[in-house]
Amino acid sequence: MEIFWILLIPFLGTMLGAGTVFLMKNKIDKKIEKLLLGFASGVMIAASIWSLIQPSINMAEEQGKVAWVPASIGFMLGIVFLLILDSLIPHLHLKSDKPEGIQSKLKKTTMMVLAVTLHNIPEGMAVGVTFAGAIIGNAGITIAGAMALAIGIAIQNFPEGAIISMPLRSEGMSKSKAFFYGTLSGIVEPIGAIITILLTSSVVPILPYLLSFAAGAMIYVVVEELIPESQAGEHSNIGTIGVAIGFVIMMILDVALG
């Protein structure tokens, strides 16, 4: 039960971020948005390395496998998985009028929420598979280390929640409705985490693959969406600074608590 509440921490980050719609103006300043996008990227990159890929390598070594094989295969499968989802699920990215995925008649609002929801899937998997490793007691993953990842994801979810709810508000949606949709986009994280824990507890031999799989999926989101959006237009250096800050904070969290 205690772990269940910890799994809700990332979702809480999304909810608090979406809640900024009640406190701020209808639009986020472009410089702040770039900083937040860069920050989220930095957190996810650091989490992928220290909380997922490194434990994947360690666990593979403990299992007597060639350490780089599970990490490499799982990472590439994670990239391919998100690539397939990206091409199948109808969604619309922020600041874009061109929907991606299979053609549909879904509302613009729904497709915007689906875009963020799609990117939250690997984050939920990452938290779930890390807790599974901690529960099993392999790869040097501790509950504290898994909690560090959950906190890190929650921190980067805060700007994501704001970045989805604020544009919805600026398009005329009520604050309460914008908050609801912003929060809804993060619900897949605890669900994905719980499902991943239930699955990985019975498939210990492939846990190194699952750890690196989650890392690959997260890096896909960073490279495909977050970094390009943070670098578009003027003041791209602000996004770069955000990446550095997010990376260092997540690294400190993982080393201090892990």
Regions found by a protein language model. Name each.
Residues 1-258:
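Intrinsically disordered, metal-sensing/regulatory segments
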